[in-house]
């Protein structure tokens, strides 16, 4: 018989940098999960990735205090900032522009995000990522 699921925990954690401090410790502790076991498993699974790259993770907590977790692709905003070497987006995105991104860069980001997007094809995914870029105050070229 399948284990009874008691909840899902969604977090965004830098690759290879999971530790028991907030927000990880309190979120897992509320469900009675082994915090250090999660931190070791997460860090082991993300050691081949770029250190510090923010990754969304969905942790499934079971009634017997065990858990599983699924890593998602990094948020589009993080990938856009990395592609054009930005620290943060514009506070007034429609008036203050902070950079430019090309179609080739958008396609690269869309390919990275394909498994987590609901877009029908690459072109639709590129348009989705371009919309995110525009909402950050980044000018899109060739879209």
From Swiss-Prot:
Record PTM: One or more lysine residues are methylated.
PANTHER family listed in its UniProt record: 60S RIBOSOMAL PROTEIN L12, LARGE RIBOSOMAL SUBUNIT PROTEIN UL11M
One GO term (biological process): translation
A single cellular component GO annotation: cytosolic large ribosomal subunit
Keywords: Methylation, Ribonucleoprotein, Ribosomal protein, RNA-binding, rRNA-binding
GO molecular-function term, one example from the UniProt record: large ribosomal subunit rRNA binding
Subunit structure: Part of the ribosomal stalk of the 50S ribosomal subunit. Interacts with L10 and the large rRNA to form the base of the stalk. L10 forms an elongated spine to which L12 dimers bind in a sequential fashion forming a multimeric L10(L12)X complex.
Family assignment from sequence similarity: Belongs to the universal ribosomal protein uL11 family.
NCBIfam families: L11_bact
Physiological role: Forms part of the ribosomal stalk which helps the ribosome interact with GTP-bound translation factors.
Protein name: Large ribosomal subunit protein uL11
Domain of life where this protein originates: Bacteria
Presence of the UniProt keyword Nucleus in the record: no
């Amino acid at each position: 018989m399948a284990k009874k699921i008691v909840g899902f925990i969604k977090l965004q954690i830098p690759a290879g940098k999971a530790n028991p401090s907030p927000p990880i410790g309190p979120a897992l502790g509320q469900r009675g999960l082994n915090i250090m076991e999660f931190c070791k498993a997460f860090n082991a699974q993300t050691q081949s990735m770029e250190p510090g790259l923010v990754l969304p993770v969905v942790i499934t907590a079971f009634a017997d205090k065990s858990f599983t977790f699924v890593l998602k692709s990094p948020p589009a905003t993080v990938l856009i900032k990395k592609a054009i070497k930005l620290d943060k987006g514009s506070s007034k995105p429609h008036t203050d522009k902070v950079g430019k991104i090309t179609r080739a860069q958008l396609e690269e980001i869309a390919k990275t995000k394909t498994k987590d997007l609901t877009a029908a094809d690459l072109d639709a995914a590129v348009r989705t990522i371009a919309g995110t870029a525009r909402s950050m105050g980044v000018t899109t070229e060739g879209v």
